[in-house]
Curated annotation (Swiss-Prot):
Record flagged with keyword Heme: no
UniProt subunit comment: Interacts with atp1b1 C-terminus.
Subcellular location, record wording: Cell membrane
Family statement: Belongs to the NKAIN family.
UniProt lineage: Eukaryota, Metazoa, Chordata, Craniata, Vertebrata
Cited InterPro entries: Na/K-Atpase_Interacting
Alphabetical keyword list: Cell membrane, Membrane, Transmembrane, Transmembrane helix
Membrane topology value: Multi-pass membrane protein
Main location: membrane
Protein name as annotated: Sodium/potassium-transporting ATPase subunit beta-1-interacting protein 4
Entry-linked Pfam families: NKAIN
Residues passing through the membrane, by range: 10-30, 35-55, 62-82, 151-171
Organism: Xenopus tropicalis
Listed GO CC annotations: plasma membrane
Length: 208
């Protein structure tokens, strides 16, 4: 297929998804966000699988990628609800760290314009190095940065899902048409040649 088709568009989308996922994975590692780290890892694996399937004309791999894209959209919708505190969700909770640490998003202290100040906690020994961290002057609150990340992931995943379905249908049609004309199966050609030779042999022995 030419590069202007849905196949090459899906390759481009998978590449963009890999770049966006790797960028997000770095900042989630910096913020010790273990649930997003695990989800990002699975997303990277599924995207590589979809990219391989698209390059190698493997519709089953592309279908697996499309199914994951639906799961990925659901996960990012949950993240948007989490950071916007929809319902009983609380962005200050330890849900995304599996309750093993009190870390928040890396952007909560390192966002655009944020100034991080530390003050020692009164009554705590200096050797324990406990301090109170305050962040002021942020141009954009960290939850909105996370929401924008998730919105971008949703957009790419939806486009990827649509093109994955299209590419899968194209691959399937090509396989069906290829099988119809014989494909790599040598039997039809061999069978025709054998039948022709048999007829010629029979005609040569007909009485004059």
């Amino acid at each position: 297929m030419a590069c202007c088709t849905g196949r090459c568009t899906l390759i481009l989308l998978c590449t963009l998804q890999l770049v966006a996922a790797l960028e997000r994975q770095v900042f989630d590692f910096l913020g010790y966000q273990w649930a997003p780290i695990l989800a990002n890892f699975l997303h990277i694996v599924a995207t590589i699988l979809g990219l391989f399937g698209t390059l190698q004309y493997r519709p089953r791999y592309v279908i697996a990628y499309a199914l994951w894209a639906a799961v990925w959209v659901t996960w990012n919708v949950f993240l948007i609800c989490f950071y916007l505190e929809v319902g009983d969700l609380n962005k200050e909770s330890e849900l995304l760290t599996f309750h093993v640490s009190q870390h928040q998003s890396w952007w909560s202290e390192h966002g655009p314009g944020c100034v991080r100040k530390e003050a020692p906690v009164a009554g705590v020994a200096e050797l324990e190095s406990h301090s109170y961290v305050s962040v002021i002057g942020c141009n954009v609150e960290y939850q909105y940065i996370e929401v924008m990340h998730s919105a971008l992931q949703i957009l790419l995943a939806l486009l990827g899902f649509v093109y994955a379905c299209y590419v899968t249908s194209v691959f399937t049609e090509e396989e069906d048409s290829f099988d119809f004309i014989g494909g790599f199966d040598p039997f039809p050609l061999y069978h025709v040649n054998e039948k022709s030779n048999h007829l010629l042999f029979k005609q040569s022995y007909l009485p004059a």
